[in-house]
Amino acid sequence: MNISFKIEDVAVRAFGLTTIEEFTAFANGNLTVAPKAPNAKPKLIPMMTARRLSDGCRLAVDAGLELSLRNKLTGVVYSSLSGEIQHNYKVLLACANDTPCSPTDFSMSVHNAAVGNFTILSKASIPSSSVSASEDSFMQALVDAYIRLDNDEDRILVVDYNVSIPEFFINYSDSDLLDYPIAVAFVLAKGNEINICTQDNNEETYDNHQALTFLLSYLCKAKQCNIKGSNQEYQVNFSCK
């Protein structure tokens, strides 16, 4: 695989930070953060809608809306490793206990809840998709965006997010599982500032949040970073000015 594009805009919601300036300071070692620091209230989501969304979904929709206000988008791709596991757990718990299931939990338990709420709130009549590819969800979202750009779409919004993992699942998960909410959003356009190629990954390790690794390298103005997926290693080359 070999894909290329350029980044036109970035937004992030994580560690209690909401501006790219704060996150750039963190990426360069000039700001200390606590991974599970409380996140600020959404800037752009109505309160009644925000209450229905999982913690990471709120961040993802809010970050996407921020970029939609600054950019004329032609498509959107959301991705997530965790998906809506918070709502799923509540649905399963209700079934196991033979109790009524919350309509909100049921309707928000689908993987495209984030992108669906984004398109509704932004009133964006553009092609949208939600990518779930396990550990490789973010990188495959970039592939989806690249294909769209190659088919003459101009600007694609890519948002990757994670939610807090319910404690029940922590006992069955990898010890380095990222279990706090985070959302990273990019507007991509045609270009060659960033090139990604792949090679086999024979190790049983992977980056537990590919989008975060990618963003930190980008903000540090690194020339290259390697991101491990489940079966492939992604070599990312940055030639941004």
Could you say what each language-model-derived stretch is?
Residues 1-130, 160-241:
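Conserved "HGTGT" condensation-loop signature of ketosynthase/thiolase-family condensing enzymes
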Residues 61-64, 132-155:
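Active-site-proximal alpha-helical scaffold in enzymes
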